[in-house]
Structure formats: C-alpha cells, structure tokens
Amino acid sequence: MPLHVEVRGSGPPIVLLHGFTQTGRLWGSFGERLQGDYALVAPDLPGHSGSEAVRADLPTAAELVAEAVHATIGKEPCVLLGYSLGARLGLHTLLGTDLSVRRVVLIGGTGGIDDAAERERRRQTDEAMAAELENAGDIGVAAFLDRWLAGPLFARLPRSAAGRDERRRNCASGLASSLRLCGTGTQEPLWGRLQALTVPVLALAGSDDNRFGIHALRIAACAPNAVASLVPGGGHAVHLAQPDHAWRLVDHWLRA
C-alpha cells in the first residue's frame, strides 16, 4: 500500500518526514518558510493520517518513502529533511534505498540505541503505550496526545505550536502500529554504518534537548560530511518552537 503524499510550493524538492503523532502537514511556520523556495514533498508516514492503514517497520517504510518520492518527482535529486521518527527513517532511507539525495537535515535524530538491554526496555515502554492506545481506541487519542505532549521532550514547545488538531487526525491503531514497528526499541542501531554516508548532513537539535544534542554531535562525528548545530534554548521540536531560528540555520546550510 503506497503512502499518502502531498506536494506544496514549487522549486527544488525537499522531502519532509514528520515525527510520531504528527502528519505530513504539521510543519508550522518553519514549513511555510521553506515553501517559499522549495517544493515540499510531504508523505504521511506509516500508521499516520492518510497512511494510517500502512503497516511497516523502518526498512520497509524507507522503501515506501523512496517509492512515493519517485512516483511524485521522478529521479530528481532531493533534500531529505526528517524530524525525530522522520530523522531515524531518513537514515534508513539513505542507507537502504536508491533515493537520489543531495543533502540531508536531521532534526532531533539518532542512530539508535547501542545497548541491547536499554533497547529492550525502550521496546517494552513502546509496547505499553501501544497497548494503552489500542485499549482506549480512537476516543482516547486526544488524551494520549495530551500526555505525550506533556512529557519532558516537549517542555519547550508552546501549546499554540504543538498542532494538536492536526495530530488528532491520527487513529489509535495506526499510532500503536508505529510504536511497535518503528519505535527506537525495535530499530537496528545505525551508528556503525554512518561512515558510509557521503552526502552532506546537517544534524540539528535544541541545546536544551540534552540527549538528542549528544546524538547530533555523534552523527557529525560518525558521518564524514556531517555537521551539527545546536539551537540555543531549543528543545526537541525546535523547528516548531523556534521556527525562524531553525529555518535560518537550515536555509543558510542548504545555500552554502
């Protein structure tokens, strides 16, 4: 089953891969700024919104992304920009598909969890959240989103920028599937493969997002053409909370 894709704007293509509980439309004013200069190719990822019936792990989702992009823009080289879940999926797309990518932006990204015991603990946490979603059904999605967005990852994200209405387009079964199949606990660690990347990579994170700031620096150390940039005072969803600052960093790097 193909992914649902929307294209907005015109110009060189940027493929946008959203985060967990989001949709291809949820890029806020950051996306609007990009749309002024680029064609935004924005799929709904497996288990989300228009792709809610799609069930796929990260390697399979990467193939679906490549197929969707090829069906939309052909073989034209693109910029690949992913946030959180989308950043992890972006790495799988780079390493496991034939998508022609000229530059990559990873916001709040990671190469995965190295330690097997920690990875299993994360898998169990994701499974518990998936079961919670399934037990509550679609009527419980709003309450789940409130708890999700109240977590420490999003402490810096203003309520007005969180996109709750757009997130509510998701269904319980789709989100549960995403947690089970694409959660960090089920992801193969990719750190040892990043040295094979030759495409330029910008790893972006908020300076107050300690864990993912460390991941950004590690990505820059592992991939030969990667650089890291930390947005002062930024949290995990830095492109939504500080869209102008994030856009300036990304735009400057894309034009360099």
State what each model feature region is:
Residues L3-E52:
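Conserved HGGG/HGGXW glycine-rich cap/lid loop of the alpha/beta-hydrolase fold
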Residues G82-G86, G90:
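Gly/Ala-rich beta-loop-alpha elbow adjacent to hydrolase catalytic centers
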Residues L95, R102-L133:
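Flexible "cap/lid" loop of the alpha/beta hydrolase fold
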Residues E120, E134-R193:
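Conserved alpha/beta-hydrolase catalytic His-Asp/Glu region
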Residues L197, A203-A205:
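Short beta-strand/loop motif that positions the catalytic acidic residue
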